[in-house]
Amino acid sequence: MSITVFEHKQAKVIIPTTPYRVRCNCAAMVGQFTIGAAEDGVLKGREAELVIVKTIALQGDLGQTKDASWLQVWFIPVSGQLPQNLLMVTHLKTQSADNLGRLETEFVIEGQDLNQSVFKAEFVKRAGAYGDYWAVRWTHRAPQSEVEQDLLEAAALLRDNLPLFDAETTRNMKLVSNEVKLSLPESASRGRRTKK
C-alpha cells in the first residue's frame, strides 16, 4: 500500500491508497469511533474535531442494517484520539446523519459557508424503544489557527480534485444523488438557481 502526503501551505494531509475507514459505533455499550472490525476494533473516543472534505448520500445495506439511508463522510481529524491529518471515511445513518444535515441546512439559511468551519462530532447517549443507543451530535466553530485555515483550503482542493468514494464498503448501496457539496454557489445563496 502506498501513501500520499498532500501539502498545502502549512497543512499536510496523509492520503492512504485504501480508504481509512472509521466506524461511528452507536451500539449501547460502545458509543465511540472505532477502527477495525466491530468485535475487536480499537476504540478511539467519543469526540473529535474535524474538517469535512465531502459527503455523499447513499441508500442500501451496510453490515446488519438493511435498506437504510446513509451519509458517506470524508474528513480529516484535527483533534481527538483519531489520527490527525489523515484522510478518513465513515458512514452515518438515521439520527447522526440527520444531525449533520440539520446543521448544513442551518448554514444555508444563515448564508454561512460550511467550508469555513471546523466540526465537532460528539457521541451522546439516547434512550429508544429498543434500549439505549448513541448518536453523533454535530457542532462547529471557526478555524483557530493558520494551520486549521490551511487545512480547510486543502480540504477544498481535495474535494475538487480527488475521486473520493468508498466503493468497497458501499457495494450494496446506490447513490441517492450527486455528491453533496458543503456549500451552495454564491448565486444560489442570493436566491437564483444554477444548473450543473
Question: Where on the chain are the PLM-derived regions?
Answer:
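OB-fold ssDNA-binding interfaces and closely related basic DNA-contact patches used
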Residues: 1-83, 128-129, 141-145, 149-150, ...
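Generic N-terminal initiation segments characterized by hydrophobic and/or small/turn-forming residues
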Residues: 40, 55, 97-100, 111
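N-terminal start-of-chain detector that recognizes signal peptides
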Residues: 45-47, 90-94, 108-111
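Short acidic, glycine/tyrosine-flanked loop/strand segments centered on an H-E-D-like triad
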Residues: 74-105
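Short nucleic-acid-contacting surface segments enriched for D/E, G, S/T with interspersed K/R
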Residues: 100-120
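OB-fold/S1-family single-stranded nucleic acid-binding modules
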Residues: 117-156
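Acidic, low-complexity/disordered segments
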Residues: 155-163
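Long, charge-rich alpha-helical interaction segments
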Residues: 168-172, 176-179
